[in-house]
Amino acid sequence: MKLRTNAGPLQGTIQVPGDKSISHRAVILGAVAKGETRVKGLLKGEDVLSTIQAFRNLGVRIEEKDDQLVIEGQGFQGLTAPCQTLNMGNSGTSMRLIAGLLAGQPFSVKMIGDESLSKRPMDRIVYPLKQMGVEISGETDRQFPPLQLQGNRNLQPITYTLPISSAQVKSAILLAALQAKGTTQVVEKEITRNHTEEMIQQFGGRLIVDGKRITLVGPQQLTAQEITVPGDISSAAFWLVAGLIIPGSELLLKNVGVNPTRTGILEVVEKMGAQIVYEDMNKKEQVTSIRVVYSRLKGTIISGGLIPRLIDELPIIALLATQAQGTTCIKDAQELRVKETDRIQVVTDTLNSMGANIKATADGMIIKGPTVLYGANTSTYGDHRIGMMTAIAALLVKQGQVHLDKEEAIMTSYPTFFKDLERLCHD
């Protein structure tokens, strides 16, 4: 598709879709909680729809009523063996978390994904789940999907130190631990997003978080809840950056989730000189509205414990850095290489093709700015965040056209992205 270029100031108010991480977990926990769970504000992107369909195939009744998702949970014993393969589409979250959940079930299941998901490493969950007594393996020396899993009603608790910073691996172990008899401990390398821990407690589960160590004594039962999903900060990030780099822009981003394990991008842009104001902050619900205006920015260093708190925002932060004065260094982000694409290489190649000055490194990027961006032929490579980054970059282009291939990938997390973009350009 041909992207909008040479945009004037962006003006208006935006309500971004529901948080993808919280939406997944609301469905997963609701499916094994006892009673009727109702979810408001659920993201209806393709990834979350894959999770919903998986649980329907596992015998859970899920339907939409009055703009809410209603899940009829029957507890951990309420799942039934699927009559078909579980297709997780493009969703690594679906595959890894549901594998952890099914670890304690007395049946066998095969889990598959699309071409992109089939290239993403699964050994990171295979090893701990095998230690708990699950028969699980992937193809190509257990590394990649499809996954074949035979659950075990008699799971063993484990103490597991994560070799990488991964909320998905942590979550898979905790979901299995809810069904294991005894004490399971997960020790993180760096603190990652904690939605699973918070939502297990919200559903009546018990665990202890002590710094980087999470302790859970199982087995436990969960109780149905009413969940309101806040706006996704990872989706809001695209408008945050657009407002900062397009001269004359002023945007109000409504109802954005600001869980502290996800707000690294806000700290980074403020350090770079961004003018942002928080309105209607609700610290208990971890939700705020964010007013952003065009700002002159300077380069920075992004590394260490900050990386897990903004890992999904690094592509759009890279674009931001192309418009900042000076050099921005992103380090310790090697996990980007095993996302939907090798995001280090794809971000570098895409933005450099438009005139940016970015050098890819083994674990990040070195970005020099500011640079003028020009038209180019680009692709999402099947990665939703690459597609949205490119669409925001195109708004700065004053010479040439920007063509984007495989734009349908954006449906994964933000089905109304282009509709919202057009509205902000016209408000």
Swiss-Prot record:
Q: Which residues form a coiled coil?
A: none
Quaternary structure, per UniProt, is: Monomer.
Is-annotated flag, keyword Glycosyltransferase?
no
List, from the UniProt record, the residues annotated as the active site of this protein: 312 (proton acceptor)
Entry protein name: 3-phosphoshikimate 1-carboxyvinyltransferase
Q: Which Pfam families match?
A: EPSP_synthase
Provide the gene name from the record.
Answer: aroA
SUPFAM superfamilies, A to Z: EPT/RTPC-like (SSF55205)
**Binding site residues for 3-phosphoshikimate:** 20-21, 25, 166, 168, 312, 339
InterPro entries attached to this UniProt entry:
Enolpyruvate_Tfrase_dom, Enolpyruvate_Tfrase_sf, EPSP_synthase, EPSP_synthase_CS, RNA3'P_cycl/enolpyr_Trfase_a/b
Lineage, please?
Bacteria, Bacillati, Bacillota, Bacilli, Lactobacillales
Sorted alphabetically, the Gene Ontology cellular component annotations on this record are:
cytoplasm
Family, as annotated: Belongs to the EPSP synthase family.
Question: Matching PANTHER family, A to Z?
Answer: AROM/DEHYDROQUINATE SYNTHASE (PTHR21090), PENTAFUNCTIONAL AROM POLYPEPTIDE (PTHR21090:SF5)
What NCBIfam families does its record include? aroA
Q: What is its EC number?
A: 2.5.1.19
